[in-house]
């Protein structure tokens, strides 16, 4: 009977990344909240260029948070394997 393959484990770099992931997500979420508040600022509502820039920054911040959660899930799956 062939040996069963070992489940993937975290390497050194991935382990350190996983250990710091919660902090990274919290920082990214704080930045996302700040971007949301900035985009909702009524003082810039009349300036379409400023609104567009803030919305682009907001979209990038949301993408970063989503990316971090996806990476965390990937690392978590390896840890639990």
Each model region followed by its residue ranges:
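Charged, heptad-repeat coiled-coil alpha-helices that serve as long linker/dimerization "arms"
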Residues: 1-81
